[in-house]
Swiss-Prot record:
The gene is glmM. Its EC number is 5.4.2.10. Binds 1 Mg(2+) ion per subunit. The lineage of its organism: Bacteria, Pseudomonadati, Campylobacterota, Epsilonproteobacteria, Campylobacterales. The active site is at S99 (phosphoserine intermediate). This is Phosphoglucosamine mutase. One of its GO terms (biological process) is peptidoglycan biosynthetic process. It comes from Wolinella succinogenes (strain ATCC 29543 / DSM 1740 / CCUG 13145 / JCM 31913 / LMG 7466 / NCTC 11488 / FDC 602W).
Length: 446
């Protein structure tokens, strides 16, 4: 039985992800982690979705049923769970969130005791336990062996101190006017506190979660409101987080969204110039623009490409000994400070780069030109093996023969096909994209 996608278990709350399935997943995960338990503690956090309460209670029931003691810390960013799991010496950390997805979706992400996301082997083992009804039944405890759960509200201070320590001590945000969009999500309290304590004048939008407005026309996936607010208050910069605050989108003082690849390039240069890039390497994904690779090559920084997903970026970083990587979507990993993408660390590193440059954000972050690139997320009715679709390989060969780069893949969390085309001729690119969309609508029921 396949439960895990590209980023944990995810689905419509109350449909694919029910109270019953969450309880079973708690049982299965508890059985898995107890085999290597050190402290018999598991940390659980969540974002601000209404369904988070249902899933949290069910998950905790499963974990305590197999003997685990559970620490519940309420709404906190995903990277906070990763950090606090290790800091509080827990066997594992669990985040209940569907990240940037709509409020009626939810998900469950697992972290090991070192704060890293589980590898695929661990996920497969949990899936096998989940499907073994006899093992689930036999592993449940009774009497004094049943685990306990407790809520702790004061751990937020640990995370705030940790994030503030990632900002260079010689720099200050005094005099910086910024707008912060917390997407009505997990960082709605912690993010404004961090920037204010570092001296910035902070204007906060979308910081009033009500259970169903998370990511709604706001945050990292829809930064229009942020752009308008930056212009309205004449801010120096704007930052948008997503629902669980592991992703960052930057808006300059003109209200323009900074391209994710340009941000990766700027931050790689920031680390190199401050002598904190461990190796002349940066990791991005197959989605990143070729212009980023060429820009970094001129600076003698080699760009490595991983599969799509911050988990795969981190795996390649660890394998190659790199301490910086990211996705153009805004997942940026500074492994000196975080075990996963952290929007708040990324925002502070961006501010450090801009401050040291002495330039306005629009000039500091716009340091190379991109090749025309177009991405379409096409809703589809079915997923077929791409190579088995009649005419697929012929179409891809034709595109590549005209000098365009293509990347076609299914979303790991939604019924969508992601179509990416890139090349130097923008007009021809549009025509090829139209042809691709028509082809996949006809073959996949878009």
């Amino acid at each position: 039985m396949k439960l895990f996608g590209t980023d944990g278990v995810r689905g419509k709350a109350g449909e694919k992800l029910t109270a019953f399935s969450a309880m079973k997943l708690g049982l299965a995960a508890g059985i898995y982690f107890r085999k290597q338990s050190k402290t018999n503690k598991i940390l659980v956090g969540k974002d601000t979705r209404r369904s988070g309460y249902m899933i949290e209670n069910a998950l905790v029931s499963g974990l305590t049923a197999v003997g685990y003691n559970v620490i519940q810390i309420g709404p906190m960013p995903t990277p906070a769970i990763a950090y606090l799991t290790e800091d509080m010496r827990c066997d594992a950390g669990i985040m209940i969130s569907a990240s940037h997805n709509p409020f009626d979706d939810n998900g469950i992400k697992f972290f090991n005791r070192f704060g890293f996301k589980l590898d695929e082997e661990a996920e497969r083992e949990i899936e096998a336990i989940y499907a073994d009804e006899a093992l689930l039944e036999a592993s449940q405890k009774s009497g004094k062996e049943i685990g306990a759960s407790k809520r702790i509200d004061d751990v937020v201070g640990r995370y705030i101190v940790h994030i503030k320590n990632s900002f260079p001590k010689e720099l200050s945000l005094h005099g910086v006017r910024m707008v912060l969009d917390t997407a009505n999500g997990a960082a709605y309290k912690v993010a404004p506190t961090i920037f204010s304590e570092l001296g910035a004048e902070v204007f906060v939008i979308n910081d009033a979660p009500n259970g169903h407005n998370i990511n709604e026309s706001c945050g990292a996936t829809q930064p229009l409101m942020l752009s308008e607010e930056v212009k309205r208050v004449r801010a120096d910069i704007g930052f948008a987080l997503d629902g669980d605050a592991d992703r960052l989108v930057v808006v300059d003082e003109r209200g323009e969204v900074v391209d994710g690849d340009k941000l990766i390039g700027a931050l790689a240069m920031h680390l190199k110039n401050s002598h904190t890039l461990e190796k002349p390497l940066a990791v991005a994904t197959v989605m990143s623009n070729l212009a980023l690779e060429e820009f970094l090559a001129k600076a003698k920084i080699k760009l490595l490409r991983a599969g799509v997903g911050d988990k795969y970026v981190l795996e390649m970083m660890q394998k190659e000994g790199a301490n910086f990587g990211g996705e153009q979507s805004g997942h940026l990993i500074f492994s000196d400070f975080a075990k996963t993408g952290d929007g708040l660390v990324s925002a502070l590193q961006t501010m450090a780069f801009v401050l040291r440059s002495g330039e306005r954000a629009s000039r500091a972050l716009n340091i190379f030109d991109l090749y025309p690139q177009k991405l379409v997320n096409l809703p589809i009715k079915q997923k077929k093996e791409l190579k088995e679709i009649e005419g697929f390989e012929a179409l891809m060969s034709e595109i590549e023969s005209q000098g365009f780069r293509q990347l076609i893949r299914y979303s790991g969390t939604e019924n969508k096909l992601r179509i990416l085309l890139e090349g130097k001729d923008g007009r021809a690119l549009e025509k090829w994209m139209e042809r691709c969309v028509e082809f996949f609508k006809a073959t996949l029921g878009g």
